[in-house]
Amino acid sequence: MNLPVQTDERQPEQHNQVPDEWFVLNQEKNREADSVKRPSLSYTQDAWRRLKKNKLAMAGLFILLFLFVMAVIGPFLSPHSVVRQSLTEQNLPPSADHWFGTDELGRDVFTRTWYGARISLFVGVMAALIDFLIGVIYGGVAGYKGGRIDSIMMRIIEVLYGLPYLLVVILLMVLMGPGLGTIIVALTVTGWVGMARIVRGQVLQIKNYEYVLASKTFGAKTFRIIRKNLLPNTMGAIIVQMTLTVPAAIFAESFLSFLGLGIQAPFASWGVMANDGLPTILSGHWWRLFFPAFFISLTMYAFNVLGDGLQDALDPKLRR
């Protein structure tokens, strides 16, 4: 007996369907949440951005720019020649005609101050550049080679570092005679030692990084690796050291001038002018010492605060 086949004709249950867009993530909002708000900046741009936030360092930078500009155009702003003498205008105080007064020979102190700025700043910058060239090459090779070569090169540095700096400079000045070139040579004989030690320490830290090892693997020569891979990553410390070398050289030149071993007449530097003006303080001629000493102090202060600012700005650990 065939039983009738019962078919389930029940309709499928109707469920309330949730719109698909409810389950779609808001990609735009997630993308905004995951994105970094800080703009992409290069190392140099980021360092400049942080340096601009340091008001003291920026003040030092503007002071130095002012001094360098005045060293170029300052002597031309005065109608008086740097070597012109006038026995009727001896030791005149600052006035509308002589803005910084005159010296014992009637020469305009304003003109001589900015002419002396050329020599003082030139000595400082040249000493820093020579220290940079010698110190970077010497320290870079010592740090990169390592081993016995590094030990020998560092023993030489220790010997030079142990010598009395000013004694060596004075001895060279006596042997070679006074002059601008002699001063620069004397200041750089041992002045590069500090730069070499800093560069060596930086190179020792980064010479085993992957990109340096890759250059070695592809057969790059030592000086190419130092120039292309190592030096660009040590420039922060090098620049800071140079900003400290310049005022040190200016101060050393001023000290030598106080000892009578500086620039010879009729030329003048800030140190020579300060040395000439020192005995006149008791006579009431204060301006002869004040202006050169003031600009020496201002230059050293500006370089030091700029160096501190650059040290903070160029430090990769401080990047945000």
Swiss-Prot record:
Any Gene Ontology CC annotation: plasma membrane
Keywords, ordered alphabetically: Cell membrane, Membrane, Peptide transport, Protein transport, Sporulation, Transmembrane, Transmembrane helix, Transport
Any single biological process term in GO: peptide transport
Sample GO molecular function, one term: transmembrane transporter activity
Induction info: Nutrient deficiency conditions, which also induce sporulation.
Family annotation (CDD domains): TM_PBP2 (cd06261)
Family designation: Belongs to the binding-protein-dependent transport system permease family. OppBC subfamily.
Described function: Probably part of the ABC transporter DppBCDE involved in dipeptide transport. Responsible for the translocation of the substrate across the membrane.
Descriptive protein name: Dipeptide transport system permease protein DppC
Gene (name only): dppC
